[in-house]
Amino acid sequence: MLSDPIADMLTRIRNATRTHKETVDIPASKFKEELAKLLVREGYVQGVERTRPEGQKFDVLRVTLKYGEKREQVIKHIERVSRPGRRAYVSAENLPRVQRGLGVAVVSTSRGLLPDREARQQGVGGEVVCVLW
C-alpha cells in the first residue's frame, strides 16, 4: 500500500523523463488527473488520458511526456513539497516563487489546483503540493 500516491506519481514522471519514455502509466484518481491536466496547461507534459488497460480492474492515467527539439527534458526538476507527515500550507502572500518565476509551484486551494501565479492573482493560499521547473 502506498503512503503517498502523489509522490509516487511525481517519481514515475521523473523516472520516465530521465529515461526518455514517450508515455508513463499512473494509477488513476481525480486528484492525480487534475494535477496531470495542470501540467498539460502549464506546458510540462503533452497530454493525459484516462484509460482502462485490457484485463485490469482499475483505470490508469496515460501521461504523454514532452521533450525539446534535441530530446532534452522539459521537466528538469519535480519535487513533492507537502507530504502526509509534514503538510505545507501557505497564504497568498507567502506563495513561493520557484526559480524566480520560471518554475511552477502547484497549490491545492479552495478553488481547485492552481499554479502559484494564478493563486497569487486570485489572492488565495493553500497547500503547496509540488514544485517543478
Curated annotation (Swiss-Prot):
Keywords recorded for this protein, A-Z: Ribonucleoprotein, Ribosomal protein, RNA-binding, rRNA-binding
Record text on subunit structure and interactions: Part of the 30S ribosomal subunit. Contacts proteins S5 and S12.
Gene Ontology BP, a term: translation
Pfam family, one: Ribosomal_S8
Taxonomic classification: Bacteria, Thermotogati, Deinococcota, Deinococci, Deinococcales
InterPro entries (alphabetical): Ribosomal_uS8 (IPR000630), Ribosomal_uS8_CS (IPR047863), Ribosomal_uS8_sf (IPR035987)
Function as written in the Swiss-Prot or TrEMBL entry: One of the primary rRNA binding proteins, it binds directly to 16S rRNA central domain where it helps coordinate assembly of the platform of the 30S subunit.
RNA-binding as UniProt keyword: yes
Statement: the UniProt record of this protein carries the keyword Zinc: no
Similarity annotation: Belongs to the universal ribosomal protein uS8 family.
Record GO cellular component, one term: cytosolic small ribosomal subunit
Protein's gene: rpsH
Protein name: Small ribosomal subunit protein uS8
Gene Ontology terms for molecular function: rRNA binding; structural constituent of ribosome
Organism encoding this protein: Deinococcus radiodurans (strain ATCC 13939 / DSM 20539 / JCM 16871 / CCUG 27074 / LMG 4051 / NBRC 15346 / NCIMB 9279 / VKM B-1422 / R1)
